[in-house]
C-alpha cells in the first residue's frame, strides 16, 4: 500500500471521506468492546476450575513437615509452595518468601517499608530531601502509580529491543545517590513484549550505584507465559548474576500465579538475598502471622510441580496465541506499508505495543471509545500518564472473544487511519501557513 505521506492532499481528503463513512457504520453497531486491561478471558479462567476440587473437608491439610495449614504460623510460606514457586522463579526455596494473593501488593509493601524504615539500616526514604526511581518506558502503569503515590520522582529510561537503555541506567545510578530503584518487567515486558538480552541482565548485575540502598525491582510477571512451544524467549537469572558480580543484595525479584491460576486468588512471592530476606522478615512479623497456607497447599496439590505448571501454561497459550496472531494479522493487513504506525510482535506475555505518528495516540483512543471500543488510556504506559510524544498505545488481546477482538482491531485500524490523515493534513496546512506568516 502507498504510504500516506506520499499521497497528495486531494487523495488523502477523498480517502478521509471513505473512511468516515466506514466509521459511521461502526458507530451504528452499538458496540461494547473492552481491551483496556490485560485480564485473562473466561475461557482461561475455566482452565483452573479443577483447583477448586483438590481440597475437600475430608482431606488432610497437613504439610510434609507436619504443618497444619488450617492454623496460624509459617511466616514465610510452606515448604512445598516455596519449592514450586522457586522452580517457577528459578531460585532456591531458601531465598523465597511466599505472600498472599498479589505481587503488586508485595511491591507496594517493599516501597512502603523503604520509605518508613529504610533498606538494611540505611536512612528511611521519607527522611531524605529527594528520592528518585528509574522507569523504563513504555512500561507498566501500576508500577508508576506506586512510586507516584509515595511522591517519588520518576525518570524515563527509553526501552530498546534488548531492554532499557543501559548506558543511561549505568550513568544515572552511578552519579546520583538519590536514585533508589528501577522498575523492570524483564521478560515479555509490559507493554512491548520485549525480553531483556543476556548482556542487559549482566549489565544490571554489574551496576555500581552511588546509593547503597539502590534496588532493582525485577517484576518477572510473565516468566512462564510463552505463546509458542519452541519459539520462546529465555532470560538469564538475575540473582545468580548479581551474586557473581559481587552485588548479591541489589535485586528484589517478584512473581505470582495471577495469570496462571486465578487473578486475585493466586499466590505471590519475593525472591532475594539472605540479607534482604532478614531485613524484610523483621517488618513482616509485625504485619502478619502468616499468609493463606490453605491456598498455598491448594496450588501445590493442583500443579504438583513445575512440569504440571508448564503443561497448564500450554493450555493458556493455546487460547492466547490465536488472539495475538489475529491482532498482528489485522495490523499488517490494514496498516502495513502506510507509514502511520509500528507495533511489536511478542512471543509471550499479555500485550502488544503500538506506536502511532507523533501526537496521535490520544486521538486514536478517543475515537475508538466514541465507536464503542475501550482501550488502555493513551499515556498510561508512561509516568504521570504523560507520553512525551503521544504515540504509545497498549493493545491487550487476552480478554475479548476472538470474534470481538477481530472486530475491535478492525475499528482500531480504521481510527488510526482517520487520525493519521488528519495529522498529515494539518501538518501540511501548518507548513503552508508558516512561510506566509514569515
Could you say what each language-model-derived stretch is?
Residues 2-76, 80-81, 86-87, 370-373:
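N-terminal "arm"/small-domain region of PLP-dependent enzymes with the aminotransferase-like
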Residues 314-328, 340-355, 369:
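Conserved glycine-rich beta-strand-loop-beta hairpin in the small C-terminal domain of fold type I
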Residues 353-359, 375-417:
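Conserved PLP-binding active-site segment of the aspartate aminotransferase-like
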Residues 99, 240-321, 334, 421:
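Conserved core segment of the aminotransferase class I/II
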Residues 220:
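Walker B catalytic acidic pair
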Residues 364-370, 408-413:
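Short amphipathic alpha-helices in soluble, non-transmembrane regions
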Residues 61, 67-212, 223-246, 361, ...:
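Conserved core of the PLP fold type I
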